[in-house]
């Protein structure tokens, strides 16, 4: 486990799936900053966990990367590959599936919006994506027939349907029970290894970050700044109860407590 104080962005010459330089975000008439001077580079195929106290700007940062909201200052780049510009897919804590569509048709809609016009091809691809998340037999199931974990699997398949370079995940497993969350951790890591996507995963769960991330980035309380980062060399697959994961969890928790105390939260 390598610990570094993350104060600057990586050189612009380094390969990047996401590059943020001096990013600041303010809301309201008084312009109080939520994020301040964020410098962060996510390498192609890297799994980065963003961690911090509630209200530190983690979700706001994801929205900026996704293009849902503009930064007040600084630059956000998704270089992409070759001549194709990069783009990101965003997965929320709630599945946000359309309840009047089946699991498969929810994915088909994403494929249609991507530009896949042929219905047969869309159905075939939707079936393939459901297979990736172990829901091969759930194409025709309605949303109300799916458990919370199954809904999040469908939401993940829908995100994958966008063929994005970067997968942004905003506390996607926070509402699930511990056993389901544990299973989905395993499945997410397998998918990440298979697809080689870049992943930016927001969580307030320190153990979750220690289990999943190749790198864990800690944001300070408002205004959110990068306070610390950990480069994690614990091999995957990891378990929550692994000694190395427990040690890392303790180290991150201690720093998180310092940040919370420092800012009076």
Name these PLM-found stretches.
Residues 51-53:
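The feature captures the beta-strand-to-loop junction immediately N-terminal to the Walker
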Residues 66:
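Helix-to-loop junction immediately C-terminal to a conserved catalytic motif
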Residues 73-86:
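Conserved ABC transporter NBD signature motif
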Residues 101-109:
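Short coil-to-helix segment of the ABC ATPase nucleotide-binding domain corresponding to the Q-loop/switch region
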Residues 112, 119-138, 190:
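Conserved ABC ATPase "signature" region
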Residues 142-146, 150:
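Conserved ABC ATPase signature
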Residues 161-165:
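A short, proline-enriched helix->beta-strand linker immediately N-terminal to the Walker B motif
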């Amino acid at each position: 486990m390598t610990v570094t104080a993350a104060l600057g962005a990586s050189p612009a010459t380094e390969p990047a799936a996401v590059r943020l330089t001096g990013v600041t975000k303010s809301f309201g008439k008084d312009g109080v900053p939520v994020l301040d001077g964020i410098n962060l580079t996510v390498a192609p195929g890297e799994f980065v966990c963003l961690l911090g106290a509630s209200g530190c700007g983690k979700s706001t940062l994801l929205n900026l990367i996704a293009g849902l909201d503009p930064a007040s200052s600084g630059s956000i780049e998704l270089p992409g590959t070759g001549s194709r510009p990069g783009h990101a897919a965003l997965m929320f804590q709630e599945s946000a599936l359309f309840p009047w569509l089946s699991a498969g048709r929810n994915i088909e809609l994403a494929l249609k919006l991507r530009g896949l016009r042929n219905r047969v091809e869309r159905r075939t691809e939707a079936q393939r994506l459901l297979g990736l998340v172990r829901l091969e037999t759930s194409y025709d199931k309605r949303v109300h027939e799916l458990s919370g974990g199954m809904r999040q699997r469908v939401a993940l398949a829908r995100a994958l349907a966008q063929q994005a370079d970067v997968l942004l995940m905003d506390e996607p497993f926070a509402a699930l029970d511990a056993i389901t969350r544990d299973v989905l951790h395993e499945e997410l890591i397998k998918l990440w290894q298979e697809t080689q996507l870049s992943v930016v995963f927001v969580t307030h769960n320190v153990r979750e970050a220690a289990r999943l991330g190749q790198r864990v980035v800690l944001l300070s309380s408002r205004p959110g700044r990068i306070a610390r980062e950990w480069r994690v060399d614990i091999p995957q697959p990891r378990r929550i109860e692994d000694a190395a994961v427990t040690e890392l969890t303790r180290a991150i928790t201690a720093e998180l407590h310092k940040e919370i105390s420092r800012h009076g939260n």
